[in-house]
């Protein structure tokens, strides 16, 4: 197994369209040291179903759509271990278009992903709480 890689873990919040609290998009950005590839995980709707997407070598910090971010500290993990954990996070696909009450949102998936990282021993319960609380605060800065 390759050695673990150091990443700085960020919870990224992006403007929605329209920018409402239920349309703001969330991703987990694993920022690598200079010269190493970054990794971003998020879920997005594809043909009315949520799908996991991994972006490598994408620098989420350079997006013009960032509305806020939460630093969750450093994490030491191999990209393969990270992939296995992210792929294990349940994706819920509710039927309907009511995004306000949709448990299948990227926001809820991100909370479950943080909990999966905690269960695997990569982050602490305090970091999970800080991530979820920070996400909720930034998301609710949007118009209702």
Identify the role of each PLM range.
Residues 2-104:
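Non-catalytic ligand/cofactor/substrate-binding and regulatory segments of enzyme domains
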Residues 90-144:
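Activation targets extended, charge/polar-rich intrinsically disordered C-terminal tails
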